[in-house]
A protein has these predicted regions:
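Thiol/disulfide oxidoreductase modules built on the thioredoxin-like
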Residues: 164, 171-219
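Conserved redox-active cysteine motifs that mediate thiol-disulfide chemistry
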Residues: 103-129
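Oxidative protein folding and maturation machinery
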Residues: 1-99, 104-105, 134-137
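Signature tryptophan residues that serve as conserved aromatic anchors
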Residues: 112-115, 155, 166
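Sec-dependent signal peptide cleavage junction
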Residues: 215-233
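Loop/turn elements at helix/coil->beta-strand transitions in domains of secreted/extracellular proteins
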Residues: 102-107, 137-141, 163-165, 196
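Conserved hydrophobic packing residues within short motifs/helices of P-loop NTPase cores
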Residues: 109, 144-146, 169, 192
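Structural microenvironment flanking redox-active thiols in thiol-disulfide oxidoreductases
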Residues: 120-162, 174-180
């Protein structure tokens, strides 16, 4: 796993190398491999390492892009308010966070695309369908699929083929679509869990972790509702 000593040792060695070789392109490679390509990158650490690098490397387009990616990822970190979106569903209706079926609920957004890796897609859809079956009548959580497809027909076919019965939206911009940039989505499938007041609770949880987190969130909303009802009486 990520926390096995070898991974930590490698990171430490990579960091030492970067600190000592301010203008080596190997430093860029190590920065990318050991610090950027992680499930939850430590952006403060990455920023510090970028500062260490000298002009030659700082001028690189990669560093510019990295700085941009860092600021986006920080904006979409856990605890931050989720960016606004307005996207069309299959019927052509505009769907936003405050649409009737989504407002005042926790919201699980899954980003996907029919062109994504079929094994990952299948695994992700199987999980999402189980969650949907369990909670579709629950008033405390809703689901939304945001597709990064480019072709309308392929998008619609995939929804039918994979029986994705929760609300689905798309703006056909692919990975360059505004919503993918705003939510700092680098790959599909990925997901984000939002609280009822629109804050980011978690990103890219999978399997049991995702199910457990949703259960926690829903249970706590139900408890709160009970308390509120008691107060009213």
């Amino acid at each position: 796993g990520l926390n096995s000593p070898s991974e930590k040792d490698l990171e430490q060695k990579a960091e030492e190398f970067i600190q000592q070789h301010h203008s080596s392109f190997v430093s860029l490679y190590l920065l990318d491999k050991y610090f950027v390509q992680k499930e939850s990158p430590d952006f403060n650490k990455i920023k510090k390492l970028i500062e260490v690098m000298t002009g030659i490397l700082q001028d690189k387009l990669y560093i510019e892009q990295l700085n941009e990616a860092i600021s986006l990822s920080e904006k979409t970190g856990t605890g931050k308010y989720a960016p606004f979106f307005s996207l069309s569903n299959i019927k052509g209706e505009k769907i936003t966070r405050s649409s009737e079926d989504l407002k005042k609920k926790n919201l699980l957004i899954n980003f996907w695309a029919s062109w994504g890796d079929s094994i990952s897609n299948h695994q992700s859809n199987t999980e999402l369908k189980e969650i949907y079956q369990k909670y579709k009548k629950n008033k405390h959580i809703a689901m939304l699929g945001i597709s990064l497809d480019i072709d309308k027909q392929e998008w619609q076919d995939a929804i039918k083929r994979d029986t994705l019965n929760w609300e689905q939206v798309c703006d056909f911009g692919g990975l360059n679509s505004e919503v993918a940039k705003q939510y700092a989505i680098k790959q599909v499938p990925s997901n984000i869990l939002l609280s009822a007041d629109g804050k980011i609770l978690a990103k890219n949880l999978k399997g049991e972790q995702l199910k457990k987190k949703i259960e926690e969130v829903v249970t706590s909303a139900e408890e709160k509702e009970k308390q509120d009802n008691k107060k009213k009486k």
